[in-house]
Amino acid sequence: MKTLLLTLVVVTIVCLDFGGGLICYMGPKTPRTCPPGQNLCYTKTWCDGFCGSRGKVVVLGCAATCPTVKPGVDITCCATDKCNPFPKTKAPWERP
């Protein structure tokens, strides 16, 4: 029984330490492994001067903590692999 428990503990430690890190999108089709200590993926969107013609600016990445929310900026954070895909949006001229 002790051997089984010890084996489970060792396997758990190995899986946690060498899991390879969280995978987040950094661009529309660019997943990357986050650096150690950065255990969240985020999606940040906002309108700039070209929002009417190009749509919102989108920034994707990894973070240790969810970025601070600022007025006019939408931020979502998540903690599973590839949980921050590039938002599917229509071009402004395709909107009803």
Swiss-Prot record:
InterPro entries: Snake_3FTx, Snake_toxin-like_sf, Snake_toxin_con_site, Toxin_cobra-type. One of its GO terms (molecular function) is acetylcholine receptor inhibitor activity. It comes from the Eukaryota. CDD domains: TFP_snake_toxin. The keyword Secreted applies. Pfam families: Toxin_cobra-type (PF21947). Residues 1-21 form the signal peptide. It is found in: Secreted. Expressed by the venom gland. Disulfide bonds join 24-41, 34-62, 47-51, 66-77, 78-83. Keywords: Acetylcholine receptor inhibiting toxin, Disulfide bond, Ion channel impairing toxin, Neurotoxin, Postsynaptic neurotoxin, Secreted, Signal, Toxin. One of its GO terms (cellular component) is extracellular region. Belongs to the three-finger toxin family. Long-chain subfamily. Type II alpha-neurotoxin sub-subfamily. Potent long-chain postsynaptic neurotoxin. Pseudo-irreversibly inhibits the nicotinic acetylcholine receptor through competitive antagonism. This is Alpha-elapitoxin-Al2b. It comes from Austrelaps labialis.
